[in-house]
Amino acid sequence: RIVLWTLFALVLLVAPKVFTSSLSMTMLTQMGIAIIACLSYNMLLGQGGMLSFGHAVYSGLGSFAAIHVLNKVADGAWSVPVSLLPLVGGLAGLLVAALLGALTTKKSGTIFAMITLGIGELVFSMSLMLPEFFGGEGGIASNRVVGEPFLGITFGPETEVYYLIAVYTFVCTVLMFAFTHTPLGRMLNAVRDNPERVEFIGYDTQRVRFFAFMIAGFFIGIAGGLYTINFEIVTAEVVGAHRSGAYLLFTFLGGALFFFGPIIGAVMMVLATVLLSEMTKAWLLYLGIFFLVMVMYAPGGVSGLIMMNLRLAAYGMLRRLWTSYLALAGTLLVVLTAVGVIVEMIYHIKLNEAMGPEMTFMGATINTQGADAWVGATFLLITGVGLFELVRRQFVHQWSQIQEDIEAENLRRQMH
């Protein structure tokens, strides 16, 4: 464990030295913020079984609290170090979570999810009704370079902002991991798995959910404060359903069953919203397709896939699947290429018709009005799907056989 934490700290420390471009620094800072946010969300979803559709409320209000304090500092009314603004956001998130959590955590399951959805929509609608606090449609802007520099650090350069975010990311990640091993964290798992039994032995499940809800609100409020420092502007979008949906979607894609899953999901979120959105206008469609595939074939997320294969590697049986993995990757690449060609041709016809019938896809020029392009892409898609299904069935058979061999090996070890 110490090795893993040391490696994590080294990655945070060395990352800006390896990825030196302006785009890379932008993505790294956003990844740090997203890691805290997704880990906080997973305290509810993965550890507590609470499906929230309004978690952005607490990060967003944390952002607004931080930017109001930052403007007070800029006006000379208050004296708060910029490096402590994330804690201001955290306290704001904690306070709001305490107020709203007293209501939302009275119920669990579907009712809890619907209550959080309603609260999220309520706060977003209030953002348009209270321009004094939320800044109206334009939001509230500020300047993070205020106050006296501390040891020459002004937080003007993006590198200084990154390392501030990196410190908070590391500390918050350690604290949230430590929470999973506390009595409250263990009891939260019990409430998720069997709330009736927890009630039977004398614990108040609503109180357990409430405390976890407040802690999650504190950490995502810190993420909101870091958002303020990084972007220097906060709009009503930060409390919207789109942001809450992103936390849910990418936490699930990363894997809610393992602690490091939301970290993977956070990295994927930034890659999708920053890189993929610049590469294609159909990025949301691709994201939706990827989500459907993961739900159907890997509901445990990326981290679930990693842990399953690590288990096979521990028994020395992973090498039996290399051929199948290569076949799956090859056929999946064919399917993705065909889907990409068809989707991009449709988008080109609908959105870029004035630019002519030709488009470029992966370095190749394609005529969107030519029948050969459509026939070829359709044939490639049908062939790829058919081959993928054949390979998948063979893979499932191999996987089942390996699981039986592992069970037999476990029985043999127990007998000896």
Where are the model-predicted features located?
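Transmembrane alpha-helices and adjacent helix-loop boundaries
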Residues: 1-416
